[in-house]
Amino acid sequence: MDTSTVLEKYTQDLSNLPLEVRHLLEEIKSKDVQVSEARKRYQTRDHQLHKFIRTNGTLTKHPKEDQLYSKIEEDMKLVQKLQKEKILLANTALFLISKHLYHFETDIAKLERDELLPPLEHPIELTEVSKDEYAKSLNGFSDSASATPTPRNGSSATPVAETVKKIQKKKLSVKGASSSSAQSSSASRQVKRLRSEEIEDPLPYEGGSLAFNGNVAMSINSAADANGPNGEDADNNLYCFCQRVSFGEMIGCDNEDCKYEWFHWSCVGITSPPKDDEIWYCPDCASKMEKRKKKRKN
């Protein structure tokens, strides 16, 4: 690796990053508008009920009380759903930026160690804090899809910090359990999941940049020292619609020609593992198959 290779690599890797982050921020803004509208609706209905009580007393029931309460509950659930989606989008942006920043800093450090790049007069050290924040962003990203909204308080530094207060114990994904990414995709897709009770105490994996223990935490220190910036055994392939690396729980599409192959549960709206004999197609493949069926009928 030399300086020109690193420059070319990161020029290419970062070319789409601004557009990706901009798209994520626009999605968050759009959901913010939906949240605001839903809040106005249930607050208006709540005001109607309180106004009726002030006028007629608590013993007289509003003629549309049940209907109003049902609508209020519906809008509140919608707000909770949208807030979870906003957290997921924010963590996606954090993950993308953190990933590129970490690999860039480690590559620069390697070039300086090999004396291919003169050190800066005031070098930006890859501190323990930045490593911990990078690990936290990855773990927090996996948790955010299933996390319940947490009220903000004065002690929270950022919204992301609120979502990662308590790291849940994750199941080892089928993708992560594969011995090699080069295994036959048709064989690996036959096993959709690996139940958590079968791996109650998985052994830590220390060969690559990701070290899995009971909490699927990232051991950045040992990975950077042992195998360099990227890790020899790490699976750096990109999967799913979000085009990110494998993490958390994933499901494989049963279409052998699927260009994405594996999907994060949160990205395809899955909350529980499929049955062993259940066939599952990703939304993209399912849509294409449906279009082909319609063409045949016509």
Curated annotation (Swiss-Prot):
**Where is this protein primarily located?**
nucleus
Q: Where are the zinc fingers (PHD-type)?
A: 237-288
MF terms from GO for this chain are:
histone acetyltransferase activity; histone H3K4me3 reader activity; methylated histone binding; zinc ion binding
Where does the UniProt annotation locate this protein? Nucleus
**One example of a Gene Ontology biological process annotation:** DNA repair
Q: Where is the composition biased (Polar residues)?
A: 140-158
Entry-linked SUPFAM superfamilies: FYVE/PHD zinc finger
Residues the UniProt record annotates as site (Histone H3K4me3 binding): Y239, M250, D254, W262
This protein's name: Chromatin modification-related protein YNG2
User: What's the source species for this entry?
Assistant: Candida albicans (strain SC5314 / ATCC MYA-2876)
